[in-house]
């Protein structure tokens, strides 16, 4: 047989086989909706990890290989029941399938993969969430302690009470043993007749002349500003959400026992994580119980915590500090102006 006859005899058959293979490949690519497949493949290029290595990282909950954004993307692109059924029923050569289908097939090897991915996401974010909770609760507890133990603040409050009793002398309010917190903010609104001087200016002036060491009382309350930005209700909700998340992880651990060898590493990592996480959540919950004593801060000022919660106490005190500092600065500025004016007048007297 000549080479020409050989080519003529077999080339057409070979070309038909190639066409059939291309047809099968194109047909395979259409197993998943084209747009869905394209979006999935775009996601995979961003992850850029071999599929087998990626799933090993998922089962090992290895946050050094996958970050939380990548995990959330994998969750978004988990195959649906319909897609899994479609691929299970596919009888062609799976090696010819597209990247999306290959990814779905790899994911399908892991039982309950979406739940495992969510557990992985929870694990990655847990450390940051606990750190933020600890930071917030410590700020609340520190602020409460600082306010209750500040001797300078107590003395300033005593001076304000004394001023109020003098102003109300001869009335039923002239022998008060305390005052409402909101009264702290009224000091800046109460002016002397025919004068720009307010009660706050007067308070600062008296303290500057007789007890100047009290003027920096705000330094005793360093945690107040950070604590004022914290909502105790939000902290409680976050702790509750984390606690519920751990409950789901315990259920996930139990469910994975029936997975067999494929989830062996996952079970060990998850079990160790749950043990550590439950200890940290217990510590945070205990700290929150102490933080709930923030209600005692309202009682400390004679207020009802139901009407004057921690957040309102801290914002009122911060406003008082701001108004106090402003009044003192204005007093100092006015004193300098008066001093310069007196100096000029004295100089003019000399030149007469």
From Swiss-Prot:
Cross-referenced InterPro entries: FH2_Formin, FH2_Formin_sf, Formin_homology_domain
Pfam family, one: FH2
Domain FH2: 1-350
Coiled-coil annotated spans: none
Family in the record: Belongs to the formin-like family. Class-II subfamily.
Protein known as: Putative formin-like protein 15b
Species whose genome carries this gene: Arabidopsis thaliana
């Amino acid at each position: 047989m000549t080479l020409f006859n050989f080519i003529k005899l077999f080339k057409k058959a070979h070309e038909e086989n190639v066409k059939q293979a291309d047809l099968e490949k194109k047909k395979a690519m259409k197993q998943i909706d084209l747009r869905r497949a394209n979006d999935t493949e775009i996601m995979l290029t961003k992850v850029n990890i071999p599929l087998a290595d990626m799933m090993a990282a998922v089962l090992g909950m290895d946050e050094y290989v996958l970050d939380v954004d990548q995990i959330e993307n994998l969750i978004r692109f988990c195959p649906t029941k319909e897609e899994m059924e479609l691929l299970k029923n596919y009888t062609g050569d799976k090696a010819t399938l597209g990247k999306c289908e290959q990814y779905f097939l790899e994911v399908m090897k892991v039982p309950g993969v979406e739940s495992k991915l969510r557990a992985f996401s929870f694990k990655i974010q847990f450390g940051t969430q606990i750190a933020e909770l600890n930071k917030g609760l410590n700020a609340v507890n520190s602020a409460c302690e600082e306010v209750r133990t500040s001797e300078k603040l107590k003395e300033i409050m005593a001076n304000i009470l004394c001023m109020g009793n003098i102003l109300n002398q001869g009335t039923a309010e002239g022998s008060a043993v305390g005052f409402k917190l909101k009264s702290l903010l009224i000091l800046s609104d109460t002016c002397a007749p025919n004068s720009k001087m307010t009660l706050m200016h007067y308070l600062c002036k008296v303290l500057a002349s007789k007890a100047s060491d009290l003027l920096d009382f705000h330094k005793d309350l360093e945690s107040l500003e950070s604590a004022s930005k914290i909502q105790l209700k939000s902290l409680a909700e976050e702790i509750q959400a984390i606690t519920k998340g751990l409950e789901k992880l315990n259920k996930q651990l139990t469910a994975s026992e029936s997975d067999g060898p494929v989830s062996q590493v996952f079970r060990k990592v998850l079990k160790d994580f749950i043990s550590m996480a439950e200890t940290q959540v217990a510590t945070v919950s205990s700290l929150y119980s102490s933080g709930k004593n923030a209600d005692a801060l309202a009682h400390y000022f004679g207020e009802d915590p139901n009407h004057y919660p921690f957040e309102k106490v801290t914002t009122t005190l911060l406003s008082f500090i701001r108004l106090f500092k402003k009044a003192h600065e204005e007093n100092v500025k006015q004193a300098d102006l008066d001093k310069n004016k007196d100096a000029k007048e004295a100089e003019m007297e000399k030149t007469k």
